[in-house]
Amino acid sequence: MRVYQTNEIKNIALLGSAGSGKTTLAESMLFEAGVIKRKGSVEAKNTVSDYFPVELEYGYSVFPTVFHVEWNNKKLNIIDCPGSDDFVGGAITSLNVTDQAVILINGQYGPEVGTQNNFRYTEKLGKPVIFLVNQLDSDKCDFDNIIATMKDIYGSKCVQIQYPIETGSGFNALIDVLLMKKYSWKPEGGAPIIEDIPEEEMEKAMELHTALVEAAAENDEGLMEKFFESESLTEDELREGIRKGLVTRSIFPVFCVCAGKSMGVHRLMEFLGNVVPFVSEMPKLHNTRGEEITPDSNGPESVYFFKTGMEPHIGEVSYFKVMSGSIKNGDDLTNADRGSKERIGQIYACAGANRVPVEQLNAGDIGCTVKMKDVKTGNTLNGKGAEWRFDFIKYPNPKYSRAIKAANVQDTEKLMAALLKMRQEDPTWIVDQSKELRQVIVRGQGEFHLRTLKWRLENNEKLNVTFEEPRIPYRETITKKARADYRHKKQSGGSGQFGEVHLIVEPFAEGMPDPTSFTFNGQEFKMNIKSREEVSLPWGGKLVFLNSVVGGAIDARFMPAILKGIMDCMEHGPLTGSYARDVRVIVYDGKMHPVDSNELSFMLAARHAFSDAFKQAGPKILEPIYDLEDYVPADFMGDVMSDLQGRRALIMGMDSEAGYQKLSAKIPLKELASYSISLSSLTGGRASFTTKFASYELVPSDIQSKLIADHEAELEKDAE
């Protein structure tokens, strides 16, 4: 394989909802380019893209697959991305290192929630988009309705390049209004027959051709002037206008294919090879300092590692994009994130499960290598003259959590090591050894996401594991003012222990003024605050600690010990043992002994006094509340609303967005435990949602009673 220059390289991501045909399209592209002699299929489990055992088990893409084709003296690096929202990380990763996206639309359903999600990702990153309507041979396909929906969602920027003469089982021909030709195929597919457009299609074809010419001309002043003069553009001028429109996202070309029979795939690849922008034509990159980086093969070496794969018999395979310069076998580079030195071994062009050894890859190219010493996903490696870092890729917040444990307790350490290793492959899930919940929590994008994680642990790592519902990180607080005092006294010969603390607790809210007095037994006492400490608690909320002791009743040197005693107590609330938060404590009196008083004595006295006061101050349980956004087809809104109301959700608003209903709500974390499964079941997998922590709020009284009873029962069980 020859070395390709930056102006000969194009990087393309294949995006689309699950079942839209991306892997089948990838197989057809490889076949059309002569990379494979025979096409595989998802059903036969022999495609180039889906080759990991877990993908073969479930029949879905789990990881993004990188491959390349050589097409008309150009190199196309293509990444086949998972379609399920559970594996959204694959799409986001791929978009960060490619230069444009082909978004497939399932001809049976038209634009789906996943279509719009993918489009939003391209919008955020400013990537060109080509829409591709697939499965035109489905009897459910209504192409005109799909186009109308797309124009409603994306506006006039959606410009048809092609349209089918007929859809359903009779699909075998389409009209290309860029080339103004008819493409047709035999029923089994194969090479297209290219003919002039038949007379009965000419009026429609000319109308769409004119719209395409106008859209292309709008991207270049010279083309616009020529269009006004002659009302036409040559094919080359059309291509130039479309290319510029792609870069500025002012044109979203719409193509048609039946990927299963390779109908239209060759023409799509011609467009990718001849029209879409090269790496060198895209806007410049920026490093973490905001500096522009030109993808120049003569510049300093800089390589970004965007993906790590764990492959049988090989180990770690590290995938990278050359951001600047050129990388060769044996190059010595420095890891900008970890400070370590790395020597690059054999580098490869990517080909799914296979790799093609190469001597050099230039700026803009994508490749992989194996057995890196200390390189993790997201790291930047630099040569001399480059001191750059590129941002770690940002992923959506996890939406589904499970507590995980090894069936054999002796495998616990092995389980943690396996989880940390596997997270290098997929950074969209998080593992947390929670001291608070006394569980190992894994958080992912959905039930299917974590189910595949469990399968890989059991089949790849040979670990038997169980999932269970994670505990909820409740909090405790108080609702009224209370006072308590406690004397700690211990005498057993020699130096004893003595400390007495008098304090007041009350609810704390941001912005409330410090008190100037307090009332006890009907008598008002003036307060002289000597010191104030506001502690932002590690688990959220605040503790405000005021020292108002007068007359030297307690030395200031004991105040840190008193604060520590209170903090210790706040780690175990009296109702359920949960962390306490948002409390103001005023220490206003106490006693000490000239010999027996010490830090331990005052810490213990403060702990008991605070606990007694907390119990008298109307303690309540708080639960975490999350902001929820659902994207739901209108037909399912009634069922989704009903389900949310049964989950104690508070509906905040509804809106229409991109052909779907957007529903905003606030919902307790407890009620989100099975929401991913429920929403998928209610909508046939056609809805999606996002969550974000919002606040802690009081639980209803009946739920508080149950939580307290459950906690007491757990304590009794532990005591047995």
Each predicted region: which residue ranges?
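Short, surface-exposed connector motifs at secondary-structure boundaries
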Residues: 73-75, 98-103, 126-132, 248-253, ...
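Short hydrophobic beta-strand that contains or immediately precedes a catalytic carboxylate
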Residues: 78-80, 255-256, 442-443
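P-loop NTPase switch module centered on the Walker A-proximal segment
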Residues: 1-105, 109-111
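Amphipathic alpha-helical transducer elements in NTP-driven molecular machines
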Residues: 6-9, 23, 45-46, 59-63, ...
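Accessory interaction regions appended to the cores of large information-processing enzymes
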Residues: 149, 158-160, 164, 168, ...
